[in-house]
Curated annotation (Swiss-Prot):
GO terms for molecular function: ATP binding; UMP kinase activity. Its main location: cytoplasm. It holds the Pfam family AA_kinase. GO terms for cellular component: cytosol. NCBIfam families: pyrH_bact. It is found in: Cytoplasm. InterPro entries: AceGlu_kinase-like_sf (IPR036393), Asp/Glu/Uridylate_kinase (IPR001048), Uridylate_kinase (IPR011817), Uridylate_kinase_bac (IPR015963). This is Uridylate kinase. Belongs to the UMP kinase family. SUPFAM superfamilies: Carbamate kinase-like (SSF53633). It comes from Methylibium petroleiphilum (strain ATCC BAA-1232 / LMG 22953 / PM1). Homohexamer. GO terms for biological process: 'de novo' CTP biosynthetic process; UDP biosynthetic process. Keywords: ATP-binding, Cytoplasm, Kinase, Nucleotide-binding, Pyrimidine biosynthesis, Transferase.
C-alpha cells in the first residue's frame, strides 16, 4: 500500500542524460518510466515536473551574454521537449500520460488548466507539467512546489543524483552523514541546499513536505512511496 495517495515527482533534466554528456539516454528514461509505472500500479496518483538542464540551462555557460529572461524561456522550451519524451516513453510502456504546459503551444501540448489536471489525476493518468511556472526567473524546483500545492499533493519527491540530504558534501567529506529527516527551519539554519530558496519557502509555507532521494538507485521511488527509510524527509 502506498503511504501517499497523490505525489508530485520533480525530475531534473540531467537525470535523463544517464551517463551521456547531453540529451536523453534511452535506457535511463525507460528505467525511470518503469519505476513510475510501478507506483501507479500501487494506486498512487502521480504528477511530474521535469527540468530541462540536459538540453539547455538558463543559468549555465551557453547562456552567457544572453538576456536572462530569454535564456529562461529557452530553458522552459527544453522542459517541453523532455516532457514529450517522457510521455511518449510512458505510452510505450502501456501508461496514459498527459503533458500540460505553462506556456501555450497548442499544436504540441495542452495548456495547464488546474481542474483538468485534477481530473486526469483522478482518472489514473500521469500528468507531466512542462515549461516550469511559465515565468522567467523561477526554477523548475519552484514549479514543482507550486504545482504540488495546486494539485493537493501530499509530498514533493525531489529525485536527484544523491540519496538524500547530507551534513556536508559526501563527495568531498567522507564523514558526511545522511539525515533521515530534518525540519525546514533546521535545513535553513544549517544552510543545506535542498531546493532553491523560493521553492523551499513555498513548500514550508504550504506545509508541503519534501523527500529527497536518488532516482539512480533501483527501487528507491517505490520505497519512498511505501514509506520506507529512503532518502531524506524535510518536514515542517
Amino acid at each position: 500500500m502506498p503511504a501517499f495517495k497523490r505525489i508530485l515527482l520533480k525530475l531534473s533534466g540531467e537525470a535523463l542524460m544517464g551517463d551521456d554528456a547531453y540529451g536523453i539516454n534511452r535506457a535511463t528514461i525507460v528505467r525511470m518510466v518503469q519505476e513510475v509505472r510501478e507506483i501507479t500500479e500501487m494506486g498512487c496518483e502521480v504528477a511530474v515536473v521535469i527540468g530541462g538542464g540536459n538540453l539547455f540551462r538558463g543559468v549555465a555557460g551557453g547562456a552567457v551574454g544572453m538576456d536572462r529572461a530569454t535564456a529562461d524561456y529557452m530553458g522552459m522550451l527544453a522542459t517541453v521537449m523532455n516532457a514529450l519524451a517522457l510521455a511518449d516513453t510512458m505510452r510505450q510502456e502501456g501508461m496514459t500520460a498527459r503533458v500540460m504546459s505553462a506556456i501555450g503551444i497548442e499544436q504540441v501540448v495542452e495548456p495547464y488548466v488546474r481542474p483538468k489536471a485534477l481530473q486526469y489525476l483522478e482518472e489514473g493518468k500521469v500528468v507531466i507539467f512542462a515549461a516550469g511556472t511559465g515565468n522567467p526567473f523561477f526554477t523548475t524546483d519552484t514549479a514543482a512546489a507550486l504545482r504540488g500545492a495546486e494539485i493537493g499533493a501530499q509530498i514533493v519527491l525531489k529525485a536527484t543524483k544523491v540519496d538524500g540530504v547530507y551534513s556536508a558534501d559526501p563527495k568531498k567529506d567522507p564523514g558526511a552523514t545522511r539525515y533521515a529527516k530534518i525540519s525546514f527551519d533546521e535545513a535553513i539554519s544549517k544552510n543545506l541546499q535542498v531546493m532553491d530558496a523560493t521553492a523551499f519557502a513555498l513548500c514550508r509555507d504550504q506545509k508541503l513536505p519534501i523527500k529527497v532521494f536518488s532516482i539512480f538507485k533501483p527501487g528507491a521511488l517505490r520505497r519512498v512511496v511505501t514509506g520506507e527509510d529512503e532518502g531524506t524527509l524535510v518536514h515542517v
